Regions:
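Conserved N-terminal beta1-alpha1 strand-loop-helix module at the mouth
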Residues: 1-80, 97-110, 115-122, 153, ...
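Structural motif
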Residues: 11-12, 85-87
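Glycine-rich phosphate-binding active-site loops on the catalytic face of alpha/beta enzymes
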Residues: 86-96, 126-139, 167-206
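Short, amphipathic alpha-helical segments
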Residues: 108-111, 144-148
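Histidine/lysine/aspartate-rich catalytic loop segments that bind and position anionic ligands
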Residues: 112-143, 154
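Strongly charged, low-complexity linkers/loops
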Residues: 148-154
C-alpha cells in the first residue's frame, strides 16, 4: 500500500500546454506518492500508450500508478490499480479482473456509500469534491463542495485510506488532512503550476504539517 500524501490526477488539457509526461516527471521529482492516469478527452488507445510511458516513469521512481475508470487499460499497462466511479465496473468485478494485489479505489461523497465501498472490497476512497472545482461537470449535492468536515466523517466511518479530492490547493489542503484525510488528490494545483516539482513538494509539506497539528 503506498503513502497517500500527494496524489496527482493527470489531465493534459489542464496542463498549460505541457505534456502529461513532463508534468509527471516534475511531480515525481517533487515527491508525489500516487499518479492517476485520467485524461478524459483521450481515446482508449491514446491512454494506453500514455499509460505505458507513465508506468515506466513511476516504476523507476517507486510511485504507484492508478488508471481512472478503465480496468482494461490498467491491466494492459500493468498499473498498480484502478479508480472507479459510480458509472464504472463494481469493485468486486474490478478485483476479479485485476487480482488480489491490485489497488481498487472508489469515488464517494457520503458516509453510507463509503461503507458500501469498503464492504465491497475497495482499498481506498477518493472523497469529494471537497471544494468547488472546474475539472468535473458537477459538484455532487453542493455547488461549493462537500467540505472538509464531511471528509472527516467519512474517514471516521471506514478503516481504509481516504484521499480528499476536488478544488484542493496548497492553500486549502491543510484542513482536509486535519479533518482526517490520509492525503490529497489534485489536478490543476500541480498541472497548472509554473513549477510542478515545486508545487508537488509544497503540497507534501502542507500535508505533513497538517498531520502534525
Amino acid at each position: 500500500m503506498p503513502d497517500w500524501d500527494v496524489y496527482l490526477v493527470t489531465e493534459e488539457r489542464l496542463s498549460a500546454d505541457r505534456t502529461t509526461v513532463d508534468i509527471v516527471e516534475g511531480a515525481i521529482a517533487g515527491g508525489v506518492d500516487v499518479v492517476q492516469l485520467r485524461e478524459k478527452g483521450r481515446s482508449a488507445r491514446e491512454r494506453y500508450h500514455l499509460g505505458r510511458k507513465l508506468r515506466a516513469l513511476t516504476r523507476e521512481a517507486d510511485v504507484a500508478l492508478i488508471v481512472n475508470d478503465r480496468v482494461d487499460i490498467a491491466r494492459a499497462v500493468d498499473a498498480d490499480g484502478v479508480h472507479l466511479g459510480d458509472d464504472d465496473l463494481p469493485v468486486p468485478v474490478a478485483r476479479e479482473q485485476l487480482g488480489p494485489d491490485a489497488l481498487v479505489g472508489r469515488s464517494v461523497s457520503f458516509v453510507d456509500d463509503a461503507r458500501d465501498a469498503e464492504r465491497a472490497g475497495a482499498d481506498y476512497l477518493g472523497v469529494g469534491a471537497v471544494y468547488e472545482t472546474g475539472s468535473k461537470d458537477d459538484i455532487d449535492d453542493d455547488e461549493h463542495g462537500i467540505g472538509p468536515d464531511r471528509v472527516g466523517s467519512i474517514a471516521d466511518a471506514v478503516d481504509i485510506p481516504v484521499v480528499g479530492i476536488g478544488g484542493i490547493t496548497a492553500d486549502n489542503a491543510g484542513p482536509v488532512v486535519e479533518a482526517g484525510a490520509d492525503g490529497v488528490a489534485v489536478i490543476t494545483a500541480v498541472t497548472g503550476a509554473d513549477d510542478p516539482e515545486a508545487a508537488t513538494r509544497g503540497l507534501g509539506a502542507v500535508v505533513s504539517r497538517a498531520r502534525e497539528d
